[in-house]
UniProtKB/Swiss-Prot annotation:
Residues 46-56 have a biased composition (Basic and acidic residues). Transmembrane segments: none annotated. The keyword Transcription applies. One of its GO terms (cellular component) is RNA polymerase V complex. Its main location: nucleus. This is DNA-directed RNA polymerases II and V subunit 6B. Residues 1-32 have a biased composition (Acidic residues). Gene3D superfamilies: 3.90.940.10. One of its GO terms (molecular function) is DNA-directed RNA polymerase activity. Keywords: DNA-directed RNA polymerase, Nucleus, Transcription. Residues 1-62 are annotated as: Disordered. It is found in: Nucleus.
């Protein structure tokens, strides 16, 4: 009964479409190059430049680690330690991964880099060992 509703409407015309002609890629490009030989074109600079050596520029951001950076670093490092990552400090009976991460931060042994983005979408990278950290007892750790 449902087939009766579609008497001659079954053909939607998909098979009757002509095949697209194959385009030779080199032919049109060569013609464009010959027409524009006298135009000087500089290569476009992309935002994702790969620098071989980090350039030491004067830093714009604070040398103090924020409480948000501290929380993220301690949490990330504690997760790594809980998944059997090598510990960078001597243990004195500590078993809690968060306590071990705090000890590593106090001794400036965490091998992380913090990337701080600026409003113009550029960024500064700081090593954890470069930043001044205030731990939860308001005792300053590190810095110059």
């Amino acid at each position: 009964m449902a087939d009766d509703d579609y008497n001659e409407v079954d053909d939607l015309g998909y098979e009757d479409e002509p095949a697209e002609p194959e385009i030779e890629e080199g032919v049109e490009e060569d013609a464009d190059i010959k027409e524009n030989d006298d135009v000087n074109v500089d290569p476009l600079e992309t935002e994702d430049k790969v620098e071989t050596e980090p350039v030491q520029r004067p830093r714009k951001t604070s040398k103090f680690m924020t409480k948000y950076e501290r929380a993220r670093i301690l949490g990330t490092r504690a997760l790594q330690i809980s998944m059997n990552a090598p510990v960078m400090v001597e243990l004195e009976g500590e078993t809690d991964p968060l306590e071990i991460a705090m000890k590593e931060l106090r001794q400036r042994k965490i091998p992380f880099t913090i990337r701080r983005y600026l409003p113009d979408m550029s960024y500064e990278e700081w090593g954890v060992d470069e930043l001044i950290v205030e731990d939860s007892w308001k005792r300053q750790v590190g810095g110059d």
